[in-house]
């Protein structure tokens, strides 16, 4: 069978598993890198200024 009924079979397996470095469920199995910390893609930890926000809405470093 092909077409629309077959698309339901695609998402049975897990896209992301637990990352060895950061511990979050963000390691892409097929692309071999972590979407959260960048493990597998770079040695440096993936970090952006827009990532973390305090409860009162102010950004923290």
Swiss-Prot record:
The cofactor remark states: Binds 1 zinc ion per subunit.
Assigned keywords, A-Z: Metal-binding, Ribonucleoprotein, Ribosomal protein, RNA-binding, rRNA-binding, Zinc, Zinc-finger
In its keyword annotation, does this UniProt entry include Ribosomal protein? yes
- Might you name a Gene Ontology BP term for this protein? translation
GO MF, one term, reads: rRNA binding
Chain positions of all zinc fingers (C4-type): 19-37
What cofactor does this chain's UniProt record say it requires?
Answer: Zn(2+)
Q: Name one GO cellular component term.
A: ribosome
| Residues holding Zn(2+) | 19, 22, 34, 37
| Functional summary from the UniProt entry | Binds to the 23S rRNA.
Family indicated by similarity: Belongs to the eukaryotic ribosomal protein eL37 family.
HAMAP family the record matches: Ribosomal_eL37 (MF_00547)
> What's the name of the protein?
Large ribosomal subunit protein eL37
What gene name does this entry carry? rpl37e
């Amino acid at each position: 069978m092909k077409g629309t009924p077959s698309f339901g079979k695609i998402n049975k397996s897990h896209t992301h598993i637990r990352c060895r470095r950061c511990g979050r469920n963000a390691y892409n199995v097929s692309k071999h890198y972590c979407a959260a910390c960048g493990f597998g893609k770079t040695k440096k930890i993936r970090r952006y200024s827009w990532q973390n926000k305090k409860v009162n809405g102010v950004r923290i470093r």
